[in-house]
């Protein structure tokens, strides 16, 4: 009999639609297995004493599951498993599951921030233009907060009822409360020990509540201020370098968020800058060749752009710029996602509601139509493919609703999202997730094994809600990523997510809020940053 390691259970489960055994990391002493379950493999035997203590199945110090590959060939009497072999492998979803993420204490950190035209975001907050000296340790930063006296005066003239309420003769109690609020909103001064000087002059300084979130991001001493981080979309990690899609360029950062100074230009047919939206890495030196003059090499990165172009990059050809290989701007193509599987490249055209497929010579393959859907729950016609991700040679495609007034924009809302799974030939396999907690799903990655979720779980980043959902391999929603208090992690304007093999506990993400607050950050455990 073949061992568990020699069988690709994940692939077999997806193709057949049947579940396969998981290693189940119980994190409570009592797994609550009962005879009410239909499957005999998870029915409790009252004559056997089971030990499901969390420390036996899950190591909280490093987030590792014992024997996650189900290989017991070298350890017949493994103390980490129940003594009864019937319970070695349980079907996930048929037994209660305690979310391990809040035990690991996930923390959202911003490592690169660029805030553009902050005063507009703080309307109606009045601001004072202040120039913060660079590198002067004795400089002060003045935090001016709204003095709402003028605002109240305007309201008083337009609303006699409010004017009578703040009149001391009419209502002294309310007037006293307003005066107290005004006294509490006076400017405060901080030294650089508490409020670090910004890396460049700014047109406003940092505020207290009600915009404490901006202040928190900007004042973190480990945050890099990078004016080049503008409207980031998707990201990828190649050789410990983070490449982020920004208008006109791919920008490079190290794993700590420090800009490396490298950037890759993306250009259209007329030499104009185009907006990259997603990147796919190619490690095959024989596929997707590009040429410039006498130089020829395979593409190391293939870049999809919102302007309908496909660009390819290899530092041998040009270390600073990518090469335009396909231009579909004439048909108003808008590529929001790209994936490589085998010798083909797949792109989601959000505007035209289709998926384009090209071979290793960048020749269009029209026979791959990606038709077919769940007959019981078909995707509405006003939904369009938004992103495509290759996970274990299966293509996960997210669908989101187009704005009815502008096909280039997504329409957010709870339950507005679908995820389908296709073969590399474009054949529909099954529906992975529908509606539910999905809200403009974009980024997808396989959950790091040290997070404690069942093997093969998928993390889904939702642009609409700012949450990261966790689904098991069959598309059953487990939970959202949570912090140490059990609260769902929230990242406003969340876009892409990825992770590096050298940092198994860290997930990197990008976000953009109102085209003005741009961030690159991480999600990791409270005990270890990496």
Curated annotation (Swiss-Prot):
The family this protein is said to belong to: Belongs to the mimivirus R640 family.
Which lineage is the organism of this entry classified under, starting from the top rank?
Answer: Viruses, Varidnaviria, Bamfordvirae, Nucleocytoviricota, Megaviricetes
Q: Which domain of life is it from?
A: Viruses
- The species is Acanthamoeba polyphaga mimivirus
Concerning InterPro entries, the annotation shows: 6-blade_b-propeller_TolB-like (IPR011042), APMV_L690 (IPR017549)
**Protein name per UniProt:** Uncharacterized protein R640
């Amino acid at each position: 009999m073949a061992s568990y390691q020699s069988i690709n259970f994940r692939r077999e489960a997806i193709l057949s639609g049947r579940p396969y055994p998981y290693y189940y990391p119980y994190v409570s002493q009592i797994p609550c297995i009962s005879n009410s379950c239909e499957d005999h493999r998870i029915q409790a035997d009252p004559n056997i004493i089971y030990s499901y203590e969390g420390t036996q199945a899950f190591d909280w110090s490093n987030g590792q599951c014992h024997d996650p590959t189900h290989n017991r060939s070298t350890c017949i009497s493994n103390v980490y498993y129940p003594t009864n072999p019937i319970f070695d492998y349980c079907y996930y979803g048929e037994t209660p599951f305690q979310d391990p993420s809040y035990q690991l204490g996930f923390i959202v950190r911003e490592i690169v921030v660029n805030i553009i035209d902050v005063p507009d975001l703080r309307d109606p907050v009045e601001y004072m233009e202040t120039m913060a000296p660079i590198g002067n340790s004795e400089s002060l930063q003045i935090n001016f907060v709204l003095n709402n006296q003028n605002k109240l005066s305007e309201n008083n003239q337009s609303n006699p009822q409010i004017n009578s309420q703040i009149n001391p003769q009419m209502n002294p109690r309310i007037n006293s409360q307003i005066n107290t609020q005004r006294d509490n909103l006076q400017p405060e001064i901080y030294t650089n020990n508490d409020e670090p000087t910004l890396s460049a002059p700014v047109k406003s300084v940092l505020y207290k509540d009600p915009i404490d979130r901006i202040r928190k991001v900007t004042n973190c001493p480990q945050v890099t201020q990078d004016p080049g981080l503008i409207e980031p979309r998707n990201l990828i990690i190649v050789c410990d370098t983070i490449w982020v899609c920004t208008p006109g360029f791919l920008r490079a950062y190290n794993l700590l968020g420090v800009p490396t100074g490298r950037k890759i230009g993306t250009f259209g047919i007329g030499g104009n800058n185009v907006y990259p939206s997603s990147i796919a890495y190619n490690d095959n030196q024989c596929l997707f060749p590009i040429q410039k003059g006498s130089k020829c090499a395979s593409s190391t990165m293939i870049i999809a752009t919102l302007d309908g172009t496909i660009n390819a990059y290899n530092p041998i050809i040009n270390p600073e710029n990518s090469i335009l290989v396909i231009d579909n701007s004439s048909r108003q193509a808008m590529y929001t996602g790209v994936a490589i599987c085998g010798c083909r490249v797949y792109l989601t055209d959000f505007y035209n509601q289709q998926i384009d497929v090209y071979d290793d010579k960048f020749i269009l393959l029209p026979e791959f139509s990606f038709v077919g859907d769940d007959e019981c729950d078909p995707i509405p016609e006003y939904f369009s493919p938004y992103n495509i991700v290759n996970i274990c040679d299966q293509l996960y495609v997210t669908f989101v609703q187009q704005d009815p007034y502008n096909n280039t924009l997504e329409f957010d809302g709870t339950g507005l999202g679908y995820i389908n799974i296709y073969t590399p030939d474009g054949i529909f396999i099954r529906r992975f997730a529908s509606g539910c907690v999905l809200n403009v799903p974009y980024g997808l990655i396989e959950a790091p094994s040290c997070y404690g979720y069942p093997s093969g779980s998928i993390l889904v980043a939702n642009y609409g809600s700012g949450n990261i959902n966790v689904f098991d391999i069959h598309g059953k929603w487990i939970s959202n990523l949570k912090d140490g208090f059990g609260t769902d992690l929230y990242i406003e304007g969340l876009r892409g997510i990825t992770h590096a093999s050298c940092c198994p506990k860290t997930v990197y993400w990008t976000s953009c809020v109102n085209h003005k607050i741009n961030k690159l950050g991480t999600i990791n455990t409270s005990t270890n940053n990496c």
